[in-house]
């Protein structure tokens, strides 16, 4: 675990999942501060579902969250959060969240948190480091919400900087960054939308991509709320990008694609975690 000194608090968690007698078990758990998990449960055969509990009071300037997930060979873990992570107005310090997601050969990690909400005047740095093997399976998403659109609250005078690094067999395969300052959601990145989401799926294939294009067509044939999307294959990683104004349709779209991917890979359609409906 890390040493930290600063004006805010440190919250850190390390979780390791291993396959034991055909069932994925949480075999190592270490935490500091208000980041913790509930005991894994098993709505699906052998797959460990885990709720990561974020600080209930939200995150402010000076706070630091460190999340480390380690999935061992042939283990299969799904993690989500019971609600949004809220980054509040900063009095001068920067809030930081660093996620390190590691998947061993033939492991499977599904990292499916609910959205991040950035309040006006928040100062936030986000880092996600993904390290997987070429034989791993990986699904992850992130949804960033600037301000609170449902209250007509815009993101003003804040500073959000995010970085993603995706390694396959120790080779940097995908690197992305986002920089939003003040009301720059009107930039080319956001196209006037207050929310952006990214879904990452590995491994990609032409057949899976075609299946997901069909699934997106089905979803958007009934979805009337404004969303824009694009699906691309980046060096073997499928990336689905969404722009929108409401959490519910974005989560619904990602969940729909997650189910389609699971159907393609494992031969059945999983039920969404119940916590998403609360």
From Swiss-Prot:
It comes from the Bacteria. One of its GO terms (molecular function) is nickel cation binding. Pfam families: UreD (PF01774). InterPro entries: UreD. Keywords: Chaperone, Cytoplasm, Nickel insertion, Plasmid. Its main location: cytoplasm. Belongs to the UreD family. UreD, UreF and UreG form a complex that acts as a GTP-hydrolysis-dependent molecular chaperone, activating the urease apoprotein by helping to assemble the nickel containing metallocenter of UreC. The UreE protein probably delivers the nickel. This is Urease accessory protein UreD. It comes from Escherichia coli. The gene is ureD.
């Amino acid at each position: 675990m890390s040493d930290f000194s600063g004006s805010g608090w440190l919250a850190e968690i390390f979780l390791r999942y291993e396959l034991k007698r055909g069932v994925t078990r949480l075999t190592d758990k270490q935490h500091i501060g208000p980041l913790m998990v509930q005991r894994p449960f098993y709505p699906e055969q052998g797959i460990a579902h885990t709720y990561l509990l974020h600080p209930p009071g939200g995150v402010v300037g000076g706070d630091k969250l460190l999340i480390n997930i380690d999935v061992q060979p042939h283990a299969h873990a799904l993690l989500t959060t019971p609600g949004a992570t809220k980054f509040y107005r900063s009095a001068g310090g920067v809030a930081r969240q660093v996620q390190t997601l590691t998947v061993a050969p033939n492991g499977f990690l599904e990292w499916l948190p609910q959205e991040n909400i950035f309040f006006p005047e928040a100062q936030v740095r986000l880092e996600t480091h993904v390290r997987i093997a070429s034989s791993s399976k990986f699904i992850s998403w992130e949804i960033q919400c600037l301000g609170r659109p449902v209250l007509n609250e815009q993101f003003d005078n804040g500073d959000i900087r995010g970085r993603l690094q995706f390694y396959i067999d120790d080779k940097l395969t995908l690197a992305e960054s986002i920089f939003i300052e003040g009301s720059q959601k009107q930039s080319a990145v956001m196209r006037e939308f207050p929310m952006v989401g990214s879904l990452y799926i590995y491994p990609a294939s032409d057949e899976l991509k075609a299946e997901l294009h069909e699934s997106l067509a089905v979803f958007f044939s009934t979805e009337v709320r404004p969303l824009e999307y694009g699906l691309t294959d980046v060096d073997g990683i499928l990336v689905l990008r969404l722009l929108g104004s409401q959490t519910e349709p974005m989560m619904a779209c990602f969940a729909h694609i997650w189910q389609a991917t699971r159907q393609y890979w494992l031969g059945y359609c999983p039920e969404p975690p119940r916590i998403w409906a609360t």
